[in-house]
Amino acid sequence: MLEKKGVSPIGKHLDRIRTKTLEQALSKHPNIQGVKEAGGSPAKIAKIIERCGDDFFVWSGNDDEAVTAMALGAKGLISVLSNVRPKKALAMLRACQKNDFRTAGRLQRELIPLIGALFCEVNPIPVKAALDLLGFDVGTPRLPLCPMEPEHLARLRAALRSCLG
């Protein structure tokens, strides 16, 4: 019945917080230190940093935008990739912290196929599959989620091989 009205009965939902709300209320709250921004807009990250100041931390929530976000002033990344390739993800972030965006960009470009594979289905399905392929017994996704589609699993396997380390 809900589907007929255009509402998904099962899923993850995000509340978008307006930049003005962050600036005027949340960034000044003593118990709020920052925000994870995963809206897919580098312009929004820049606007939050500009309006809320350097004392209010912004973390990228998108692995494929980490370098761009950090070049704009984000403090780091809340990452899916780091669960699967922690050394490479850390090397990319450390390069950003050193303002070595040439190296950071190269590392991110190398990781793009894996990042794409990690997001080809709803999280956490691909990361659980990747960890399983790496030999970690993390179990299968809980219902209503299901195991990864075979063609996506093949893509993930190839992407993992392409960026060893």
Report residues per predicted region.
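Short, well-ordered helical secondary-structure segments
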Residues: K4, P9, L22, W59, ...
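Alpha-helix initiation/capping motif
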Residues: R18-T19, N62, R85
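Short, conserved beta-strand edge motifs with alternating hydrophobic and charged residues
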Residues: K36-E37, V58-G61, I78-V80
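Glycine/proline-rich, positively charged
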Residues: M1-F57
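Active-site glycine- and acidic-residue-rich loops that bind
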Residues: G39-G40, W59, I115-L118
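Catalytic cores of alpha/beta
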Residues: T21, I48, D64-L72
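Helix N-cap/beta->alpha junction signal
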Residues: S41, N62-D63, E149
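Structured C-terminal cap/extension of enzyme domains
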Residues: V67-G165
